[in-house]
Amino acid sequence: MTPDMPPDATADGAPDASPHATPDVQLVKDLVAEIPAFEDLYETHVFNQDGVLPHVFFWDVTQETVQSYLGLDADAPDWRRTLRFLEEQSARDVPGIDEVVVTSFLEYLPFPGKPGHEIVSELGPVMAAKFAKVRPAG
């Protein structure tokens, strides 16, 4: 670990999968480990927030995912990989994970008539069901 790395990072700079992390914090770390394109966002988040705040981080993840879906940011993490990862995590039915995915990802997806709303049709079956519960009108 170098002085400029977050305290929860491994020698290669990736977030450490700590057995003591709460499910919501572990979700963030697992996302960054699975999709390294989120590393810069993660590092900035940890620096600005002085730690990991999963709901705050996932608001940014939602924005990046929609930008990628719309093709507006070639450097944004691939939206398909993000949705696939979140679908897998949602299928685990872990309360701390579900709370973050539903509250800070699904609820912040664009509303009908807004650019990017079509991403809702790309959700896997688990997230689509959760989305329908929290936003029945789309």
Predicted regions and their residues:
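Alpha-helical solenoid scaffolds in large eukaryotic transport, assembly, and signaling factors
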Residues: 19-83, 102-111, 115-120
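Polar/charged alpha-helical tracts
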Residues: 13, 26, 30-33, 121, ...
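Amphipathic alpha-helical binding modules
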Residues: 95-138
